[in-house]
Amino acid sequence: MSENNSHNLDEHESHSENSDYMMDTQVEDDYDEDGHVQGEYSYYPDEDEDEHMLSSVGSFEADDGEDDDNDYHHEDDSGLLYGYHRTQNGSDEDRNEEEDGLERSHDNNEFGSNPLHLPDILETFAQRLEQRRQTSEGLGQHPVGRTLPEILSMIGGRMERSAESSARNERISKLIENTGNASEDPYIAMESLKELSENILMMNQMVVDRIIPMETLIGNIAAILSDKILREELELQMQACRCMYNLFEVCPESISIAVDEHVIPILQGKLVEISYIDLAEQVLETVEYISRVHGRDILKTGQLSIYVQFFDFLTIHAQRKAIAIVSNACSSIRTDDFKTIVEVLPTLKPIFSNATDQPILTRLVNAMYGICGALHGVDKFETLFSLDLIERIVQLVSIQDTPLENKLKCLDILTVLAMSSDVLSRELREKTDIVDMATRSFQHYSKSPNAGLHETLIYVPNSLLISISRFIVVLFPPEDERILSADKYTGNSDRGVISNQEKFDSLVQCLIPILVEIYTNAADFDVRRYVLIALLRVVSCINNSTAKAINDQLIKLIGSILAQKETASNANGTYSSEAGTLLVGGLSLLDLICKKFSELFFPSIKREGIFDLVKDLSVDFNNIDLKEDGNENISLSDEEGDLHSSIEECDEGDEEYDYEFTDMEIPDSVKPKKISIHIFRTLSLAYIKNKGVNLVNRVLSQMNVEQEAITEELHQIEGVVSILENPSTPDKTEEDWKGIWSVLKKCIFHEDFDVSGFEFTSTGLASSITKRITSSTVSHFILAKSFLEVFEDCIDRFLEILQSALTRLENFSIVDCGLHDGGGVSSLAKEIKIKLVYDGDASKDNIGTDLSSTIVSVHCIASFTSLNEFLRHRMVRMRFLNSLIPNLTSSSTEADREEEENCLDHMRKKNFDFFYDNEKVDMESTVFGVIFNTFVRRNRDLKTLWDDTHTIKFCKSLEGNNRESEAAEEANEGKKLRDFYKKREFAQVDTGSSADILTLLDFLHSCGVKSDSFINSKLSAKLARQLDEPLVVASGALPDWSLFLTRRFPFLFPFDTRMLFLQCTSFGYGRLIQLWKNKSKGSKDLRNDEALQQLGRITRRKLRISRKTIFATGLKILSKYGSSPDVLEIEYQEEAGTGLGPTLEFYSVVSKYFARKSLNMWRCNSYSYRSEMDVDTTDDYITTLLFPEPLNPFSNNEKVIELFGYLGTFVARSLLDNRILDFRFSKVFFELLHRMSTPNVTTVPSDVETCLLMIELVDPLLAKSLKYIVANKDDNMTLESLSLTFTVPGNDDIELIPGGCNKSLNSSNVEEYIHGVIDQILGKGIEKQLKAFIEGFSKVFSYERMLILFPDELVDIFGRVEEDWSMATLYTNLNAEHGYTMDSSIIHDFISIISAFGKHERRLFLQFLTGSPKLPIGGFKSLNPKFTVVLKHAEDGLTADEYLPSVMTCANYLKLPKYTSKDIMRSRLCQAIEEGAGAFLLS
């Protein structure tokens, strides 16, 4: 732009280093005292060849030693040992365990605010002496003389401050006296109140208690507010009210005094008529503060409607306060407050129906929740809730913007309404759209617009599934035989009355599939119990026509439930009451179906093999061993057979405050008391056994199994099995296999039905076809081609059969950590007691008697490496303390000191081997992981794991020298991510009877079949549930099946679940902990767990570089910091921008540089086609999909190979730090990388047809030529006419064989030529590049972990994903704030403009907005923070049209002026994205 208009262009805005926006949301920073981020800050000068260009500057300065220590303490687990207990050697009974605090860091020994203990003092004493030893030569003073005063200074207390001056006290007293004389001199009283308010705000609670007589002041204020003479002194009253509010804030004790002075009715009177809006708003603010502690008193005063009667005339701030008063009061409702609620509800209902402000809606939901919880038992309760109010509550559950907590409360409200009133229950069924409410509430968790319900449910929180399932349960009348539920139905018969049969049938037909999917996809016990109860109640109400429609779904579910009898036994051999409860529930459902619809369901029951399962269950139930005397009666959690809502105190709302010693903490809001709804029966094992046997006998007698006959279809299947197992059946050609597939298809699919999963496996059909496929000698290409031709129109149906069989057969178990409270994220901070016993001669090995038998409280996720460090540290400390005693009484010689130092140095290098259960443990294993895996392997009860003290033996390591050299080598390379699954990469798992089904699914997937039907809902739910066990994951104790299935059969799981699995198992300990802390952000147990807050801290490393040498500098960064566990952040010299925006731009620019032609890394064909993707098409860059160029063996290729190594590190680094790349890789590139990383798989496929298909994706014209040669391989004349030699097509410098340039192609050597070209394009020609990429990638984390992601997905992740810029998507994922709303015309124009952008403009816009030209996976929905547009105000007399938009890249914030027309807006936007790129400057 010209200079005189330069003020119009606002470049990318930036932030100071301590701005919240510059922080990556995936990690957490440490701050020093001044608020600066603690971390590395390296500077890159503008010299490309300087070998020492990395230096530390500024407040981030840290040398190499500090760097290593930083890495160690942040990524590794040093300091995870909490307690140290000393015991007498050999004494195991009646010992006194004296706990000794172990510091978190060996380098940090300063005492904090904790009480000082003698061991701490001695340790500091010893370390100070050791430091002084090194500098004490030639000094006369003894080290003790210098160290002792320091210790004493630490113990000494501080001098207390002097008391407040008497003059100030007198002044305060005079001001308070003035307020008491307000009727005589209102002005003096008002000024006195102003000064008092200001003084109070500068005091703390202790000062207020000491110098202000609160009773007097509050009494005077109450008198001012109630004095009729002062009624017109509105400014005085506002100042009085504000002074009282400030007093409440500083000294919460004063609230109770004010309530005793009857301040509430006085303030309420000020709202009857509003003549001064400022006074009204101050009154509302004051009463709201009182309501947080004394809501009950406000409720007693009555007339709640006064607070909201002028709601529409108040500012949004005052509206929130008014609703908060009502909400806080409703949290303390009792049954005798019914009239008060009746009075206020007519005013609240329209507000509730029309409110859009989320804080107001949250308060209103809390109010309704409190009303339901307290008044549900009142006679006229149902009159409080009209149909429009109920529909509004249903709507809140449905809409996406409602927070989860509010949705759960709304569902609880609906549940209480349905339970309390038959009329409301019927209205909910017939006049509201329950199905739409459920499905829309689930859609918010969908990862893609087209995801099926089974995919979405995997990500729905259990709490929401529980609430919806429970609500459906209470909608219907109880089942006749209540086995799982404990309700004693007290309502009249109206609940079972169906006034609209058509509506009811439609509801049931839609609900049952949803319930079946919830059961299949949820692994939570309570969710499944609710679903079973709901199904029992729904089935009890349906007729034959409805039952026919849901026949197959119910029977498949029952078959899946009853087939899980293997999981009913715990690891220690006892019977699981939870699994037994579900089995009994499944049998009860089957019994009900048999009673009502035996003829209708019999064929399906038979086809699914239900009878065989029931027979087996009879034996299992009879074999239940009641080791303890169980009560055969049902144990209920409440009164026998009574379903009711009970109110329990909510932890957040009823804390007790210690007025004497601590400042009272007033909550920001008061949550209503929790509604506890009891529906479940708790079944004893004795009841499960007796009831199970009873149900089995009833089912078998009803169906008369003896009359079951072998059907004609089974005869046909047996015939097909015999054909498949006959060795003479031809399978050598494509036609042979078409015949086999045709026979199989005809056997499986019939006009009226398809073979069930049970029939497919039980008849041996699955096994025989699997054997035939795996033993076939024909190429995979022929197998796949023939299968697709035959099964083309019914692949999804075949997949459904296979998935049904897998769901029924799999019996993989979820393991938990054995905690009584269920674990969760707080389990990461748990400690476990271990007893360390030295296995050897302690005195001979200088171990020390105290360490020969030691009890240690250690973090579960601590590794044995940290345990080794702990022992070395203790040995050195004890040795040093022992050496002090003679040194204090006699002067030591230089030789003595040198000998002692050598001894200590030897101890510091000592290493130990550890043994648990007589087995040597891996040093990288976690303590909990080793103990946990042993418990599982030995079938021990996991709950005892937390009660026992576990003995771990240790001895002097025989590999000490080797380990020292390895440690030194690792130190030189820099700290790396801790990999706790490294030695379990390809653990083999016995998949049992499901092996054949898994093999068939794998075959179908390898045929290139694209279908969501590959995802198995049940296994996906199990894996998601397993990943919800943080302690198991972080300890490296995930079950083998989870590792095996995700690597070997990744198609069984949705992308997001696999991505989460990758993050949990491969991204290092620090990021793993941070991932769960982010997921659990806001939970109360997380906030209160200080130990957990200290876990998983990740260091940020800030690197400042020059734009002129960005690529060369980037390579050096990758070389030095590529494997670092720190988060890397980039800044540019002479630019103010920091944080996410410049970092994303760095990754984008380096991505582009890697695609330069001059690097000679990629295939570059002059005849190459252009991709549909729109990219920068300058001559300097590769425009086709990136695929390695074959290397010329006679050229120097070291630079190219080195670049591929850097590329691998760069790509892995982007995954680790969650950065967006801008590559356009060929899918074949990752296919070959995957094959190279998979054991027992060749990099290049063995059949030519498959190879040609891969080449076609790389170079379509070359593939076409090769296919032509293959088609004419016997036509010598045609081949010779091509005049081809044995060189790589397009590159005559690379010969396929020695002397290939002189050898011509003919019919006798055509196969040699084809294989030679394939080998150069896909094999030997690019092998070194592929290996270099894998090695570079694996410097960050092992590339083998990437096998759980498909090549197509990796291509999308690294830049080729299609982006949705539709207007609907933009409206959904854009926020308008600070001057704009989503209804603003400017926002409509803006969305219309950017949705019409071309691909080049989109890239520019994203580069301008975020720093990267690409959106993350998931599109605009995945932008974090959310894309936000705010108003940019014109200043200095300029108009909005003279300004350009500006951005805050770290916050995805666009500041948009209010342009006068759409055309001007488009022009200014295009100008900004074109000219505003390339720098991050202050606007």
From Swiss-Prot:
Catalytic reaction equation(s): S-ubiquitinyl-[E2 ubiquitin-conjugating enzyme]-L-cysteine + [acceptor protein]-L-lysine = [E2 ubiquitin-conjugating enzyme]-L-cysteine + N(6)-ubiquitinyl-[acceptor protein]-L-lysine
SMART domains xref list: HECTc
Modified residues (Phosphothreonine): T87
Region annotated K-box, chain positions: 1007-1081
Keywords from the UniProt entry: Isopeptide bond, Phosphoprotein, Transferase, Ubl conjugation, Ubl conjugation pathway
GO BP annotation list: free ubiquitin chain polymerization; proteasome-mediated ubiquitin-dependent protein catabolic process; protein K29-linked ubiquitination; protein polyubiquitination; ubiquitin-dependent protein catabolic process
EC number: 2.3.2.-, 2.3.2.26
Molecular functions (GO terms): proteasome regulatory particle binding; ubiquitin protein ligase activity
Gene3D superfamilies: Hect, E3 ligase catalytic domain, Hect, E3 ligase catalytic domains, Leucine-rich Repeat Variant
PROSITE patterns (alphabetical): HECT (PS50237)
Function recorded in the entry: E3 ubiquitin-protein ligase which accepts ubiquitin from an E2 ubiquitin-conjugating enzyme in the form of a thioester and then directly transfers the ubiquitin to targeted substrates.
Protein name: Ubiquitin fusion degradation protein 4
